[in-house]
Amino acid sequence: MAQVENVSLSQIIANPYLPPFSTTLFEIVIFTFIMITLYLIFRGSGLVRRRLVLLLIAIYVIVLQLFFTPYEYTTARLLPNGTVDYVVYTSQANIVMALDVLAGLMLILAVVYIILDYLRGFGKGDEEEGVIDL
């Protein structure tokens, strides 16, 4: 197995036999399935009428942006003469990492919002929106 030196944390060792875009397409399909499942789970709970749909759309757009922005990664190809050829693809890895952190924070906020909304509405009937309980 070949060693790659001086590889930063933002670099990913990619499989040279698998094009990066097919992996990206697979991740997009899986993520779309997860978002549709979340929507179906919370569809009847009254959360969807509020901010959950906007939150899910915002998270979906941010993560799609992550998938379409290529990371900085290195591919290693074994040449016929036995040597290993390294090809480094660079991109805005810092921007991608910042968006990754932002998407993670939004996901945590969405989960906290759902839990708090569930606890706040626990035991109450389905009340109209805009009515303030004093």
Swiss-Prot record:
UniProt subcellular location: Host membrane
Keywords, in A-Z order: Host membrane, Membrane, Transmembrane, Transmembrane helix
Regions crossing the membrane: 21-41, 52-72, 95-115
GO cellular component, one term: membrane
Primary location class: host cell
Membrane topology classification: Multi-pass membrane protein
Keyword RNA-binding: no
UniProt protein name: Uncharacterized protein ORF134
Species of the source: Acidianus two-tailed virus
